[in-house]
Amino acid sequence: SGRLKGMINHQLWEKLFGGEKNIFLIEDVHNPLIRMGNCCFPIPGDKISGFIFEDKEIEIHHSNCKNSFNKKNKVPVGKIPVEVAWSISEKLTQQHILHIQVIDGAGILYQITKIIKDAGVTIINSETAAKQNNYADIRIEIESITWPVFHKIVEKLRPLKFVKKIQEEASA
């Protein structure tokens, strides 16, 4: 972070990192300067790590993602590792859209919607589309809920064998 600190003026550094702690707090997942890793799709509540690119964008990964920075991985060229943490109110509610890529099969939509229903959350809309190579895309719009409730739903969906990718889309 020493190199990065030299690149940013002192007042901006204090505002971004809160002094000498060097932790970037993420308050908005839809901030255009923040991009979520396309490999692991972290959401608030996940343990995360991050990189700052030379263009000042911050890329966030699960802390256990193969592309995250840890003592075993070398830092990729053009990336500066930075400590990151979620700073999103646990009381903030918002509508969420889940985009789930699955291996297609019987009963998959039922299993996914059951997890959402069991969390006490209402599904507003859902769309499915069959893709090539036995894959399907499922898009589910759910009612306004807090990030912790959303995180619990995603944590129950991630381990399902047929789920290949889950991400949260920005709702309109």
Where are these regions (language model features)?
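A glycine- and charged-residue-rich anion-binding loop/surface
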Residues: 154
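Extracellular/lumenal glycan-associated surfaces
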Residues: 114
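N-terminal non-catalytic structural scaffold regions of very large proteins
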Residues: 1-109, 118-119, 124-132, 141, ...
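Conserved structured catalytic cores and adjacent interaction surfaces
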Residues: 138
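RNA substrate-recognition surfaces in RNA-acting enzymes
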Residues: 135
